[in-house]
Each structure stands twice: as C-alpha cells, then as structure tokens.
From Swiss-Prot:
This is Octanoyltransferase. It holds the Pfam family LplA-B_cat. Its EC number is 2.3.1.181. Keywords: Acyltransferase, Cytoplasm, Transferase. The gene is lipB.
C-alpha cells in the first residue's frame, strides 16, 4: 500500500446529492441514527436481488439509473442489489488524479457518486442501495450513518468489530498485531467502503465489503484518498467465510437497520 500522510477531508465526503440537505444538530452523533426504518407501518418491503457471477459496471450504472427513475415515479419498489464486478477502479466526484497510481492497470470509470477512488473486483460484495429517503428520513448524514451501522452489524455476525470514524466514511478494523503508526496510534485497515448519490431523495450506488478480493489490486490507487491506512478483508482477518455467508449476514442486518425485505 502507498504510504504518506492522511489527507484531511470533511466527514461524509462520500456523498453526492442534488437533494437539499437540512443541517441538524444531531448529525454529530451517528450512533443515534442506528435505525433508518420506513415511517409508515405498512410500508412495502424492500426488494432484495442477488446477481451471480460478475456484473459489467456500465450495465450496472444503466440499471441503477433506470430503477431510481422508476422509484421516483412510483412504478418500482425500493431495491438492494448485490453484485460482484470484474477488476476496475471508480472515481467519485472528489477524486484527485494523483491518487490514480497505475491508470493502465484496470478500467477506470468516472461515476456520479461522492467520494474518491476505490476498487471493485471479484471477492468483494457490492450492495447497490436504492431507497426513497422521503419514506424514511430526509437526512443524508443519518442515512450514511445507518449504512455504516448495517455494515457493522454484518461484521459482528462473524465476531469482527467494525468501527466508524468521524473523519473517514466507511468501516474500519483496528489491527493491534500490526506495527503502530508514526504518531503512535494503532494501525487500522478499511474493510468496507461507502459512496452514494441522491437524486430527489432516492439513493443509489452504495457499499462494498471486502470478503476475499485480491488486496494487491488496491495498489493501483490511493483508496478514498487515504494513504496512511490500509485495506483488509474478512479472509485476510483469518475468517474462512463465503460470499453466501456474507449475504445471509447482510440480509439479517439490513432488516435490523432498514426494515423488511423481500427476495425474489
């Protein structure tokens, strides 16, 4: 992994929205937003779709665009779509060109999501989250905190303690077995990334959890613009889990945080 100093950025940098954001005095306390349930007791369940094999990234973008439009128009239900992609890099709206270290290594896609550079590839579970926040809460920071909570509860099913950081969106794992950083602080690795976009309060893009990707593929970028910390995966942490195991845990944790889902 590249080394260097952590480039400071504001919290929730992995957000891109063209929906109005109302400031809240509570947004400094993400734990208060552990649940992001529908406001209506009889709200329909969220559709839960798993696609086997590797999904072309451009096809995934086109699918999300169409689905978000349909959700806005009321002709389709909310959806969480679980996929894997072939190896590729994506650039968010805050991406710094200098953080793309080997531009010819894998295809690079510019996306409308918030955030910087990240990697997608086999062994990583990507969950595209298409929810209508008007049905829940028009609070972007609360939504991101709930996505973090979803990941944290998923990892807890495997006895992994995932942690959030106020200045770094995503979920982190403390690595006490690794050498401490130059400032004496404990080493931390990122195990899950978050990058979203909102269109009139309907979300798309989502989260990515490292199950068993080739971690060397991250060497072509500075992940999320953070060079001081590395990346890890469930298998890298010594857990012989499968993608199916993770999908089960994701489903249970989703219902805890966001409410009922329906598989097809």
């Amino acid at each position: 992994m590249p080394t260097g100093k952590l480039r400071q950025k504001p919290p929730y940098a992995a957000i891109m929205t063209n929906s109005p954001v109302t400031p809240s005095t509570e947004t400094q306390q993400p734990k208060r937003y552990a649940r992001f349930l529908p406001q209506e007791a009889d709200a329909p369940p969220v559709e839960w779709l798993i696609t086997e094999g590797l999904t072309d990234y451009e096809e995934a973008l086109a699918f999300m665009e169409a689905r978000v439009q349909a959700i806005r128009e009321g002709t389709a239900s909310e959806l969480v779509w679980l996929v894997e992609h072939p190896p590729l890099y994506t650039a968010g709206t805050s991406a710094n060109a200098e953080d793309l270290l080997t531009p010819d290594r894998f295809p690079v896609f510019n996306t409308g999501r918030g955030g910087e550079y990240t990697y997608h590839g086999p062994g990583q579970r990507v969950a595209y989250v298409m929810l209508d926040l008007k049905r829940r809460r028009e609070d972007v920071r609360a939504f991101v905190a709930s996505l973090e909570q979803w990941i944290i509860e998923t990892l807890a099913a495997f006895n992994i303690k995932g942690e959030r950081r106020e200045d770094r969106v995503g979920v982190w794992v403390v690595r006490p077995e690794k050498p401490r950083l130059a400032d004496g602080s404990m080493c931390e690795d990122k195990i899950a990334a978050i990058g979203i976009r909102l269109r009139r309060w309907v979300s798309f893009h989502g989260i990515a959890i490292n199950v068993e990707p080739d971690l060397s593929h991250y060497g072509g970028i500075v992940p999320c613009g953070i060079s001081e910390h590395g990346v890890t995966s469930l298998v890298d942490l010594g857990l012989p889990v499968t993608m199916g195991d993770v999908d089960v845990a994701l489903g249970k944790a989703f219902e805890s945080v966001f409410g009922p889902r329906q598989t097809k």
